[in-house]
């Protein structure tokens, strides 16, 4: 059960609360899905499990894109409350609460957080779609909404920004992400223009991974107070390219 209330005109407040609930559900879908990249799986229950929550330290540097057969299932309290006095570094529920904190906090409302919300909504739509092509397209749109400015060639800007945001600092890593993103986005254009494009599962997983990592990187930089607006993000990426 999600209970959300907003002040103001009753009808407008109701619509705002409905939209807030949808976005929170999308964020839970996002968090639940990306947990597989951290070598564990989040299982959300509809009954009380707080007495059986299992703590786990998470290393955010050791990511995995491959499917794992030995996933560990952990029960997680998704109440986003402060009721449990557990060290935030050892409780996985608290860790993801920390990760998504800026998106759920109205006091940090700005253009960059709006981009994050939109991108997570597209990620969630991709998870809920049963069509590979549609899921792929939704992720591509999420990448566009997060990392393009609309000023120059979308493919070039999107590929560069993805590479400088999520790749390692060495040239080869950035070139790999850049070239991969260019190839993926070419397929997005083919789908959008009615071309006979058939997306493979590995291509969907790749662009979905890029979108997830882009979202996480930006949230981490907001948390570290390195960027606080879309203008800051653009400046950061430009400095990475030309600094």
Annotated model-derived regions:
Residues 122-125, 138, 180, 187:
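Short, hydrophobic/aromatic alpha-helical segments in well-folded domains
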Residues 117, 131-134, 150-164, 169-190, ...:
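Polyanionic, low-complexity intrinsically disordered segments
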Residues 136-151:
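Hydrophobic alpha-helical packing segments in soluble, helical-rich domains
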Residues 127, 143-144, 163:
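Generic hydrophobic alpha-helical scaffold/packing signal
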Residues 1-134, 204, 212-218, 222-243:
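Charged, non-catalytic interaction/linker regions at domain boundaries
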């Amino acid at each position: 059960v999600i209970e959300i209330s907003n002040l103001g005109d009753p009808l407008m407040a109701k619509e705002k609360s409905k939209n807030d609930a949808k976005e929170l559900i999308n964020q839970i879908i996002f968090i639940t899905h990306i947990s597989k990249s951290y070598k564990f799986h989040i299982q959300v229950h509809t009954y009380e499990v707080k007495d059986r929550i299992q703590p786990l330290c998470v290393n955010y540097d050791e990511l995995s894109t491959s499917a794992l057969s030995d996933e560990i299932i952990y029960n997680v309290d998704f109440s986003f409350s402060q009721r449990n006095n557990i060290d935030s570094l050892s409780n996985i529920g608290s860790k993801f609460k920390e990760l998504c904190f800026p998106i759920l906090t109205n006091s940090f409302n700005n253009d960059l957080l709006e981009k994050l919300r939109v991108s997570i909504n597209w990620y969630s739509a991709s998870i809920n779609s049963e069509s590979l092509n549609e899921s792929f397209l939704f992720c591509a749109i999420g990448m566009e909404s997060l990392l393009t400015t609309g000023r120059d060639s979308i493919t070039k800007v999107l590929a560069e920004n993805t590479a400088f945001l999520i790749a390692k600092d060495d040239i080869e890593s950035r070139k790999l992400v850049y070239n991969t993103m260019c190839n993926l986005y070419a397929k997005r254009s083919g789908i959008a223009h009615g071309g006979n494009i058939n997306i493979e599962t590995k291509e969907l997983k790749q662009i979905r991974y890029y979108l997830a990592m882009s979202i996480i990187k930006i949230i981490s930089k907001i948390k570290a107070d390195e960027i606080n607006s879309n203008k800051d993000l653009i400046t950061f990426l430009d400095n990475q390219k030309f600094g």
